[in-house]
């Protein structure tokens, strides 16, 4: 009788359960069921935190559309901001991250990748050997008491290449596929948009090592297939774009994007075929135009020694020279590629007056020509007219099908695949003996990343509505939240919970005391559980569970066979 009386006073305590409290604090169940009474879920508005984040976004991009995803993540109790670009994950946020990492582990296993954990501290020496140390201004550099130089690694190409190089001797030791999921660091000048651009972030990076170029390309396609399967299972619309490798090296690269107004990348797609490319790599069909007049823009090399004259045909314009301000007619990415082809690095971000002063002191001059000027040049200069320097504009003709038209859209990059070739293996001496025992050859590498914390922020940006977050099933903190109206016996709530859990549903019970059913429903919307299951009036009278699912537009559906019904709902999420 005493036990029965105690359970009546403390509702929603099932068999094999107990509760304890510290002093006069909240009671916490200690059974094996997932209960919100056992989670720290500090939901609610965090004014100071959100105002600081809004100020950062306004400072970085004053006219950009406001992104509410970070405010929902903070209000729903997923994270807290410590400083600009630095965040603490709370229990709900960690569950989302753990689920995403488990999904990544599953698909990395499909390409026979082994998991490692490299140190976040890398040595300056390796980065100097690869040539990336001086070229990267966003490295977080540190020194120890002996004045030895280190850095907090943003990526691990150097470290993992050196480690593998010390362990391989023959082509028979290959292929090798190693990946890790860990914290990375970048000295972001303007952190913004919450998890989308932070100083500390979690990333999955896979590194592949193959004997031949052909083997490396086969590996690249296998990883791309695994990525497609991963993003398909995630069930969030995504776009794969051809991309430029940048300072990572290599020529083959693809990016995975969520299309959203808060994205900082511009993704171009054709309305007539499957052509998709990012703004660094996008091309359009080169249209021949009469170019009676030439506009010459002026730039300078990164070492300030070389003047760069950029010649572009301007139909209907007057000849004009020494123009320091580039306009919307130029493609800065194409210009950078054209200049790099001449083995000159382009300086960017200089003010007009500064550029004009520096150019007056240069000792060398190189000329770059738009491809449309080729017919007007002598043979020596025509070789320098190999790039289309005109800006890509909406409606331009697709270079692939030559029929469709190009349209831009903002994208959030959440994944990237690189074929690196021998970019790192050569300088770091990752070589193997060949079958003929001839001179050793450098191995061919690939690097494939997924921004784990960024993907969490991107999913929140893409799927939230005015009520709150709206997680896909694969990474939701829980798939179903179960709650009961006052008066529903705890044994019946436990029975429904156990039935769902036994069917493989990841369910959590909202057993928090002192909160009304209406408050719990609003809190569930804010947190973003895929499915809300309610034991209310219909349960008391008809033994039916009320189900809500915002992502599918379902509200108030009653289910007698709730186990099968909920499983079908989740299958669509």
What are these regions (language model features)?
Residues 2-573:
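NTP/phosphate- and nucleic-acid-binding module
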């Amino acid at each position: 009788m005493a036990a029965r009386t105690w359970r009546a006073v403390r509702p929603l305590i099932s068999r094999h359960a107990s509760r304890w409290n510290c002093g006069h604090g909240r009671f916490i169940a200690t059974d094996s069921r997932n209960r919100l009474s056992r989670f720290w879920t500090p939901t609610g508005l965090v004014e100071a935190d959100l105002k600081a984040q809004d100020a950062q976004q306004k400072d970085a991009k004053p006219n950009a559309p406001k992104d509410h995803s970070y405010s929902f993540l903070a209000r729903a109790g997923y994270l807290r901001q410590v400083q600009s670009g630095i965040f603490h994950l709370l229990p709900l946020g960690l569950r989302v991250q753990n689920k995403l990492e488990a999904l990544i582990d599953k698909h990395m296993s499909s390409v026979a990748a082994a998991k490692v954990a490299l140190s976040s501290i890398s040595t300056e020496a390796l980065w100097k050997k690869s040539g990336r140390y001086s070229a990267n201004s966003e490295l977080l550099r540190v020194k120890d008491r002996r004045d030895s130089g280190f850095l907090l690694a943003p990526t691990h190409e150097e470290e993992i290449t050196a480690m593998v190089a010390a362990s391989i001797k023959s082509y028979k030791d290959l292929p090798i596929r190693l990946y890790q999921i860990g914290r990375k660091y970048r000295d972001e000048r303007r952190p913004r948009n919450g998890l989308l651009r932070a100083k500390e972030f979690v990333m999955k990076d896979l590194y592949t090592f193959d004997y031949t170029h052909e083997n490396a390309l086969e590996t690249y396609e296998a990883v791309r297939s695994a990525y497609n399967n991963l993003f398909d299972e995630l069930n969030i619309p995504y776009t794969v774009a051809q991309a430029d490798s940048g300072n990572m090296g290599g020529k083959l690269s693809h990016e995975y994007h969520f299309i959203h107004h808060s994205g900082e990348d511009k993704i171009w797609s054709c309305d007539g075929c499957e052509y998709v490319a990012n703004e660094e790599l996008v091309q359009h069909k080169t249209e021949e135009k009469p170019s009676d007049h030439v506009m010459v823009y002026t730039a300078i090399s990164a070492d300030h020694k070389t003047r760069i004259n950029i010649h572009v045909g301007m139909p209907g314009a007057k000849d004009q020279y020494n123009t320091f301000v580039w306009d919307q007619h130029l493609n800065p990415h194409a210009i950078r590629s054209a200049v790099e082809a001449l083995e000159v690095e382009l300086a960017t971000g200089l003010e007009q007056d500064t550029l004009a002063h520096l150019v007056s002191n240069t000792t060398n001059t190189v000329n770059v020509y738009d491809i449309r000027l080729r017919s007007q040049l002598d043979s020596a200069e025509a070789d320098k007219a190999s790039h289309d320097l005109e800006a890509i504009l909406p409606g331009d003709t697709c270079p692939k099908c030559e029929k469709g038209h190009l349209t831009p859209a903002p994208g959030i990059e959440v994944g990237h695949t690189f074929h690196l070739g021998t970019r790192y293996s050569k300088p770091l001496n990752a070589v193997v003996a060949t079958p003929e025992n001839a001179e050793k050859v450098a191995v061919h590498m690939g690097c494939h990343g997924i921004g784990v914390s960024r993907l969490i922020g991107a999913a929140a940006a893409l799927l939230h509505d005015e009520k709150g977050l709206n997680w896909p099933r694969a990474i939701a903190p829980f798939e179903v939240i179960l709650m009961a109206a006052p008066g529903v016996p705890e044994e019946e709530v436990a029975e429904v919970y156990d039935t769902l859990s036994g069917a493989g549903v990841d369910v959590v019970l909202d057993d928090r005391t002192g909160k009304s059913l209406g408050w719990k429903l609003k809190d569930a919307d804010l947190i973003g559980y895929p499915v809300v299951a309610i034991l209310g009036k219909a349960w008391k009278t008809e033994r039916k569970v009320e189900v809500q699912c915002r992502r599918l537009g379902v509200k108030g559906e009653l289910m007698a066979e709730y186990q099968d019904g909920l499983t079908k709902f989740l299958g669509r999420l």
